[in-house]
Amino acid sequence: MFDIGWSELLVIGVVALIAIGPKELPGVLRMVGQWMGKARKMASEFQGQFNEAMREAEMADLKKSFDDIKATANTFSRDNIMTSLQKDVDAAMTIDKIEHIDTSPVEPTTPEPPTAETLLEAETHAASISAATAVTEVGEPLAITQEIHPALPSPEPAAAIAIAPIKDAKAS
């Protein structure tokens, strides 16, 4: 603490013995010891109060940080994506309730096959559009046209086709 070595303490002890005398030396040493005890006690109290103040300041900082995080979390929970997802899931769960509603079944309908008149209209419409604009736009509906089937040759009778004998690869 004071950076005093053993030799320096011995010199102080000899000077105190000569200056104070052997009769009063124990009382003086006791008083010096009490002063040293009081000084150490005051130093430890100061250090304890300083450490407590540091802990309180640190706790105040931690409390402030915690409050900031809590406020941020509250703003996220109000506009939370999970909240909107939960609402979507809840809405999807109501589909089960829709099954209990009495509705008459809808008859499926099939479109009528195209007639010669509708094919002719589609071809004239496609021709007028391709003449008016060279580039076809993406959003335009496709024209209905008649499929052209090539004439299929008549199949030959099965007797005319010569069947080659099947050979076993292992046998040869």
From Swiss-Prot:
Q: Coiled coil located at which positions? A: none
Q: Which InterPro entries match?
A: TatA/B/E, TatB
Gene3D superfamilies noted in UniProt: 1.20.5.3310
The reply on keyword Cell membrane is: yes
Q: Name one GO molecular function term.
A: protein transmembrane transporter activity
Q: How does the UniProt record describe the way this protein sits in the membrane? A: Single-pass membrane protein
One GO biological process from the UniProt record?
protein transport by the Tat complex
This protein's GO CC annotations: TAT protein transport complex
Q: Tell me, what does this protein do in biology?
A: Part of the twin-arginine translocation (Tat) system that transports large folded proteins containing a characteristic twin-arginine motif in their signal peptide across membranes. Together with TatC, TatB is part of a receptor directly interacting with Tat signal peptides. TatB may form an oligomeric binding site that transiently accommodates folded Tat precursor proteins before their translocation.
What is the designated name of this protein?
Sec-independent protein translocase protein TatB
What would be the name of the gene that encodes this protein?
Answer: tatB
